[in-house]
Amino acid sequence: MEERKPITHITAGLVIAGLVIVFAIITNFLGLTQQKSLGFLQYLLIIGGLMFFVNQFGKANNYTKSFGDLFAFGFKSTAVFTSLYIVFIIIFFLLFPDIKEKSLEMARQQMEQSPNVTDEQIDKGMEIARKFFWVGVVGGSLLVFVIVGAIGSLLGAAITKKQPHNPFDQPAV
């Protein structure tokens, strides 16, 4: 078989982060952040990217990697793109504070639509949302991306062909 240079998890993470960041910028500036289906599209983009890169990693290693090796590659890629995305989202909200205010206002509107919530509860909820905004953004992004990354890594490792070397098949010396 021909010798292939394996792709690194850093490269895979950078490419996926780039795709997700471009997608986030486009949806924010086009005002499409309220559409839930686009959020799911972002997760499918991550899962599809991980499956592609895990498969390419297996292919570059002549499919000799085990399920655990392939999953680890995908999860390390997840760590890279999650870290980059969190840095991006912090910088993005600092550069565009109006987007933070719009997201808080959307949260207020959703609370106002609920008939069981009083104005006092809405004000208290908004106070808490403002106080813990950064914890919610960073923690929420971290949690969701790690879960989605684990799913993508599992699927990528599962669909990649595996022909690991058996250590007992080595010729005697």
Per-segment meaning from a language model:
Residues 88-114:
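Functional transmembrane-helix hotspots
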Residues 1-6, 161-173:
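Short, charged juxtamembrane terminal tails flanking transmembrane helices
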Residues 1-56:
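Transmembrane alpha-helical insertion/packing segments
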Residues 110-133:
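Short membrane-interface loop/juxtamembrane segments of multi-pass integral membrane proteins
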Residues 7-15, 72-84:
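Alpha-helical transmembrane segments of multi-pass membrane proteins
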Residues 19-27, 46-50, 81-89, 148, ...:
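Alpha-helical transmembrane segments of multipass membrane proteins
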Residues 134-162:
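Transmembrane alpha-helical segments in integral membrane proteins
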Residues 56-70:
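Membrane-helix interface/capping segments
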